Regions:
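Macrodomain-like recognition of ADP-ribose-binding/processing modules
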Residues: 1-133
């Protein structure tokens, strides 16, 4: 029942197909909108180090939106990955999961740096690693 409900909700918002967008370079697309409606190979999630999604109800972060509309299976897959790994996901690293109820095929989860006070060169390098991984 969850799957039918989530797919219907996403369809109501309208699916955006990558074939209707223009690449900024071969195979790379830059698009602004609701990432949970994008039909493509993979979307990127700004994840936390636990990798199991945001736990603040109705929080408007990308992590919560992706986990909520993908369905509970995504949290279960991320939990399984993290249990095998036995530690939090390091900043700048990435994991790939199935997308479940989202129109894309995969989700790339990457953990960005937490900038407390002042941006440092290490913060910049950690963020660059998110894109490289």
């Amino acid at each position: 029942m969850q799957d039918e409900y989530l797919k219907e909700e996403i369809n109501k918002k309208g699916i955006v197909d990558i074939n209707n967008l223009n690449p900024i370079q071969k195979g790379i697309y830059l698009w602004q909108g609701d990432i949970t409606t994008l039909r493509c190979d993979a979307i990127v999630n700004a994840a936390n180090s636990a990798m199991t999604g945001c736990y603040l109800p109705n929080h408007r972060c990308i992590d919560n939106a992706i986990h909520s509309f993908a369905g509970v299976e995504l949290r279960l897959e991320c939990d399984e990955i993290m249990n095998r790994q036995e530690h939090g996901e390091p900043t700048g690293q990435a994991k790939i999961t199935n997308a479940y109820n989202l129109p894309c095929k995969y989700i790339i989860h990457t953990v960005g740096p937490i900038i407390s006070y002042k941006l440092t060169s290490e913060d910049c390098e950690l963020l660059a690693n998110c894109y490289r991984s």
